[in-house]
Amino acid sequence: MLTKEITLCGKVVTLAYCYATEIAYKDLSDENIADYIKDAVACIQKETDPDVKHTIYAIIACMLAYYQSRGEDAPLTDTDLMNEAKPAELGTAIFTIIGLRMDFYHVPKGEPKDATTIPDASPSGTEDKGKN
């Protein structure tokens, strides 16, 4: 089980990703978490807010996966998240869930390209070496 601690509503909570997370999300929302994550990424790229209800479902699913596997109650409820979570905390949670899911499915992370591999864009087709 992959886990990560984040702060939500002033409490440090552990989010986990495993098959139980996907099942819990499906039970809460009657949708596939992969679809939510795709929508959340699209919202973030357009700098709009993803559906808060589905963000809360995803957070609760990740908390339940961790705390119930340990026989413990989750430290936050959906009501706590709706009423007390700051937008930045919800954003952090979305990125955390995306990262955990990528790690769970072994999705390779892109490597930044070295500056030397960037094609020359000068009009003459020659490199500008900074000479006058």
Residues covered by each model-derived region:
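Charged interaction scaffolds used for protein-protein
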Residues: M1-V12, N32-E47, Y57, S69-N132
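Short capping micro-motif at the N-terminus of alpha-helices
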Residues: L15-Y17
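Short, surface-exposed, low-complexity cationic segments
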Residues: Y19-K38
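Short, solvent-exposed helix-helix connector turns and helix-capping sites enriched
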Residues: S29, E47, D51-V52
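Elongated alpha-helical scaffolds
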Residues: K53-A61
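Amphipathic alpha-helical interaction segments
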Residues: C62, Y66-R70
